[in-house]
Design a protein with these regions (language model features):
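Two-component/phosphorelay signaling modules centered on CheY-like receiver
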Residues: 4-29
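Short beta-strand/turn micro-motifs composed of small residues
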Residues: 1-5, 72-76
Length: 119
């Protein structure tokens, strides 16, 4: 039940950010994963807590989009299991932190990915 709440909360946060910044982003949401894509970027947010499901989901994404950015949003993150499984994650947001810190972290990732590239 908590995973569903976390998933829909994350979906609302992402939609709000996209609306505020008027980004040309397409959202596809299928629990436990939210996919955002533009012409240049593929970004996935995963809200899984079970390590076996995380590994399977990340590998499935990598087969479809090799250069996609994957962010794990979950409590109780086991960093050693992620390292041992050689999962390539763009970032990890620990939801055991206070809500404001989680929001700031999510906004930092979104700003980094969707900011205009200055050459």
């Amino acid at each position: 039940m908590i995973q569903w709440i976390q998933y829909y909360w994350l979906l609302l946060v992402l939609k709000k950010y996209i609306r505020q910044h008027k980004l040309p982003v397409t959202i596809h949401s299928t629990f436990p994963m939210i996919q955002l894509h533009t012409n240049r970027n593929w970004l996935y947010f995963i809200t899984i807590t079970a390590p076996c499901k995380l590994s399977t989901t990340v590998n499935r994404i990598r087969r479809q989009h090799l250069h996609a950015k994957i962010i794990l949003v979950a409590p109780n993150v086991n960093y050693s299991e992620i390292f041992e499984a050689h999962l390539e994650l763009f970032g990890i947001v620990d939801t055991k932190q206070p809500l404001l810190m989680v929001m700031d972290e999510l906004n930092e990732y979104l700003e980094y990915i969707f900011q205009p590239k200055l050459d």
